[in-house]
Amino acid sequence: MARAKNGTVHVARRKRILKKTKGFWGTKKSNYKKAKDTLRKGMMYATRDRKARKRDFRRLWISRISAALSDTGISYSRFIEGLLKSNIKINRKILSNLAIEDAEAFKKIVLEIRR
């Protein structure tokens, strides 16, 4: 009886890794050992940066809102407190877009909070 060495699975696994590293530079796309390590590291970065992207966007929205509020003479923390007290339920992303694209609507929200 012939010895079964699981060759098809071995080849398929290597092909799968090398297929995922298609656009990489140098031997990281063709050498299995380097490709495997680079892919693992890339997946770690991807996971980390998906989490970081959420924090980065929230920070950006807060900066934009704060910059738009500098003209009105109200601080960001007072603005958010006023939103909660006025029961205005608009998230930071929408407020940021309003501050950039529709300044009049944003100023109306600020006036509503000051009342």
Swiss-Prot record:
GO terms for cellular component: ribonucleoprotein complex; ribosome. CDD domains: Ribosomal_L20. InterPro entries: Ribosomal_bL20, RIBOSOMAL_L20_CS, Ribosomal_protein_bL20_C. One of its GO terms (biological process) is translation. One of its GO terms (molecular function) is structural constituent of ribosome. Keywords: Ribonucleoprotein, Ribosomal protein, RNA-binding, rRNA-binding. Coiled coil: none annotated. Belongs to the bacterial ribosomal protein bL20 family. This is Large ribosomal subunit protein bL20. It comes from Borrelia garinii subsp. bavariensis (strain ATCC BAA-2496 / DSM 23469 / PBi).
